[in-house]
Amino acid sequence: MTDKLIIFDTTLRDGEQSPGASMTKEEKIRIAKHLERMKVDVIEAGFAASSNGDFDAIHTIAGLIKDSTICSLARANDKDIQRAADALKPAESFRIHTFIATSPLHMEKKLRMTPDQVFEQARLAVRFARKFTDNVEFSPEDGSRSDMDFLCRVLEAVIAEGATTINIADTVGYGVPELYGNLVKTLRERIPNSDKAIFSVHCHNDLGMAVANSLAGVKIGGARQIECTINGLGERAGNTSLEEIVMAVKTRKDYFGLDVGIDTSQIVPTSKLVSQITGFVVQPNKAVVGANAFAHASGIHQDGVLKARDTYEIMRAEDVGWTANKIVLGKLSGRNAFKQRLQELGVSLDSESELNAAFMRFKDLADRKAEIFDEDIIAIVSEESALAHEQEHFKFVSLSQHSETGEQPHAKVVFGVEGKEVTGEARGNGPVDATFNAIESEVGSGSELLLYSVNAITTGTQAQGEVTVRLSKSGRIVNGVGTDPDIVAASAKAYISALNKLHSKDDKVNPQRS
């Protein structure tokens, strides 16, 4: 009988710490529903004490998700833990994840605490968390750079207090596979009560070894939980990639001897959703979910795949949710056909009004674009769902622009400001620059444009463009996304979406990193 590997997803918490990846409550809910559909074991929905917005998102997700355990991060103090417990009350199954730094560097320079003080705070934090649930996780932050004797002492104490999961954090991505795997192994061997807890690994990708270190923690160290994010999303170089972990363990079950309960057909749809929401485009050569992951350019490889796919493919594209572009609907398709296709794609909308709005967007697109693909439908629904829940201080209405070779383009943008239509006009160094200048001529947001990117949703010259705009103001970074066959119109929509997020400010306490 094989062991079960627990998949702990922290896209909504650690992934969101990536600059520019902050999500609204509604965006978090959409991702959480996809993670549940994927059958993720544990969803870390956020850090409840960081802000009222994060508390509310965790509380709502806890009430909606039934098939995954919902978790909140909490620093090792009563206030944070109480806040996490309150946020998690609606959940059918929940976990409190508390942590404190244990490395000499962090204790001295950041916490300004002695080892004995850290030991006592860790022990008491777990004891307090156990008052709310018997599912308590403890992480020694910067565990991979901690003194072994002290680490063993702390972990033995928190297990004695009732911690059921011990998560060894390689917070700065310093570990290498053999050493990290042996660290986990040594801890399990030296701690007398280690058999009372499941050991977990949490690795960062600063040296490009997050996945390798995590797998070593499992194979060498005996860990049975991996903490990871969709697309490896996370601050600095990112976190361990969920899709790579899952497919490595499934594809090489002969080596790892572990079962994972993930529905792998949901991997690519979830990857695309996270990319669309955060604006972090997946690189084409990214394992499993990159556009080129199953592409073969070499003639020898193409010949082999045509004769027998397993000559050059160790997993099937359809097993992870890749589907060929497929024309599914046209301008004569009705509302019922549209609704049925959404159900087939596993896409849900919260209300009939959202469905009606999405259908009208579809009909408008069908009048302008001869071929409608699944990807087009997903983009329409994603944007419509975001608009339905977005605080629409600003609303795009229309755009016209004119340019001639050798002259600065001119743009005129009509948009709503709290229900009142205004018109902005301006010139710029290109049609997009002119469009943004036209919006700012009326808004005067004072924000800085950090990123502008365009991604074709499907192939061909009629493809919709998906534009991501990243704005920064007063240290706050937000993303806006817009889609349209007209790239300049998509750009205006994305810019206005980002402005709406800047307008609905939700300040967060910056947590210690785990």
Swiss-Prot record:
Annotated Gene Ontology cellular components are:
cytosol
Name the segments for region: Regulatory domain.
395-514
Give the catalysed reaction(s), semicolon-separated. 3-methyl-2-oxobutanoate + acetyl-CoA + H2O = (2S)-2-isopropylmalate + CoA + H(+)
Q: In which pathway does it act?
A: Amino-acid biosynthesis; L-leucine biosynthesis; L-leucine from 3-methyl-2-oxobutanoate: step 1/4
The family database entries (InterPro entries) matched by this protein are listed as:
2-IPM_HCS-like, 2-isopropylmalate_synth_dimer, AIPM/Hcit_synth_CS, Aldolase_TIM, LeuA/HCS_post-cat, LeuA_allosteric_dom_sf, LeuA_bact_synth, PYR_CT
Q: Which CDD domains match?
A: DRE_TIM_IPMS (cd07940)
| Entry annotated with the keyword Repeat | no
Known cofactor(s): Mn(2+)
Domain annotation Pyruvate carboxyltransferase: ranges: 5-268
Q: How does it assemble?
A: Homodimer.
The protein's name is 2-isopropylmalate synthase
Q: Which organism's genome codes for this protein?
A: Burkholderia lata (strain ATCC 17760 / DSM 23089 / LMG 22485 / NCIMB 9086 / R18194 / 383)
Q: What is the lineage of its organism?
A: Bacteria, Pseudomonadati, Pseudomonadota, Betaproteobacteria, Burkholderiales
